[in-house]
C-alpha cells in the first residue's frame, strides 16, 4: 500500500504548477526566465502575484494531499511522511518535465502541514523573519526547513527520519544558491 501511494504521490508531485500555469496564462516559462526555477518565488518575479499565489497553493496542495490520503488509509506517521516525500521528489525531479523541477520548499510545507501543522507555523515564522531581514528567499528556506526537526523530534518522532532526509534534499537543491550566497551574488527582492 505504501509503495502504491508513494508512486501516486510522485506522479502528483511531478505536476509543475509553475510551468502549467505559465502555459495556461501565456506567460514566460519560469524555467527559462528569472532564476530558472519553476516555483512560486520565480513565478512572482516572472508572472506576478496572482500566478505566484496559484503556484504556491498548487505546490502546497500536492504535498498535503498524499499525506492526508495516507492518514485516511490508516498508515502511521512515518509512512505518511515517506509518501509525502515522494510528492516532494516528484516536484524536484518531475517525470512530465524532463526531471527539471523546483526546490521543493512549498511542497515540503504542504507535506509538513499534513504531518504536524505547528511545525509549519514555526517554519513559516522563521521563513518570514529571515526573509524580512535578508530579502532572500533561498536563505529563508534554508533557515526555516531544518528548524522543524527539533519540534518533530519532540512531538512527532516517527516523522523525524523522513524529515531529516527531506531537509537534506532541500539543502541539496539549494546548493547553487548556497554558492551564490557565500559569493555575495544571490538574488534579493
Curated annotation (Swiss-Prot):
Describe the function of this protein. Catalyzes the transfer of an acyl group from acyl-phosphate (acyl-PO(4)) to glycerol-3-phosphate (G3P) to form lysophosphatidic acid (LPA). This enzyme utilizes acyl-phosphate as fatty acyl donor, but not acyl-CoA or acyl-ACP.
List, alphabetically, the SMART domains matched.
G3P_acyltransf
Give the pathway annotation.
Lipid metabolism; phospholipid metabolism
Q: What class of enzyme is it?
A: transferase
Organism, by scientific name, is: Pseudomonas aeruginosa (strain ATCC 15692 / DSM 22644 / CIP 104116 / JCM 14847 / LMG 12228 / 1C / PRS 101 / PAO1)
Q: Where in the cell is it found?
A: Cell inner membrane
What does the entry give for GO biological process? Answer: phospholipid biosynthetic process
Q: Where are the transmembrane segments?
A: 1-21, 50-70, 72-92, 111-131, 151-171
According to the record's subunit comment, the protein's assembly and interactions are: Probably interacts with PlsX.
Q: Which InterPro entries match?
A: G3P_acylTferase_PlsY
Primary location: membrane
Return the protein name.
Answer: Glycerol-3-phosphate acyltransferase
Q: How does this chain sit within the bilayer?
A: Multi-pass membrane protein
List the EC numbers from the record: 2.3.1.275
What are the entry keywords?
A: Cell inner membrane, Cell membrane, Lipid biosynthesis, Lipid metabolism, Membrane, Phospholipid biosynthesis, Phospholipid metabolism, Transferase, Transmembrane, Transmembrane helix
Pfam families reported in the protein's UniProt record: G3P_acyltransf
Q: Which reaction does it catalyse?
A: an acyl phosphate + sn-glycerol 3-phosphate = a 1-acyl-sn-glycero-3-phosphate + phosphate
Signal sequence region: none
Q: Which gene encodes it?
A: plsY
Amino acid at each position: 500500500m505504501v509503495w502504491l501511494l508513494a508512486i501516486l504521490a510522485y506522479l502528483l508531485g511531478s505536476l509543475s504548477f509553475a510551468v502549467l500555469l505559465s502555459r495556461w496564462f501565456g506567460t514566460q516559462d519560469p524555467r527559462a526566465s528569472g532564476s530558472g526555477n519553476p516555483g512560486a518565488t520565480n513565478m512572482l518575479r516572472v508572472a506576478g502575484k496572482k500566478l505566484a499565489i496559484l503556484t504556491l497553493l498548487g505546490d502546497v496542495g500536492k504535498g498535503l494531499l498524499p499525506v492526508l490520503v495516507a492518514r485516511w488509509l490508516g498508515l502511521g506517521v512515518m509512512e505518511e511522511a515517506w509518501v509525502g516525500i515522494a510528492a516532494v521528489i516528484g516536484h524536484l525531479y518531475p517525470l512530465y518535465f524532463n526531471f527539471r523541477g523546483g526546490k521543493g520548499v512549498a511542497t515540503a510545507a504542504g507535506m509538513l502541514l499534513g504531518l504536524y501543522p505547528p511545525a509549519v507555523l514555526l517554519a513559516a515564522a522563521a521563513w518570514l523573519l529571515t526573509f524580512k531581514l535578508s530579502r532572500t528567499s533561498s536563505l529563508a528556506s534554508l533557515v526555516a526547513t531544518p528548524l522543524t526537526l527539533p519540534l518533530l523530534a519532540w512531538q512527532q518522532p516517527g516523522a523525524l527520519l523522513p524529515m531529516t532526509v527531506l531537509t537534506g534534499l532541500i539543502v541539496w537543491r539549494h546548493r547553487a544558491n548556497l554558492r551564490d550566497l557565500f559569493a555575495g551574488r544571490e538574488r534579493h527582492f
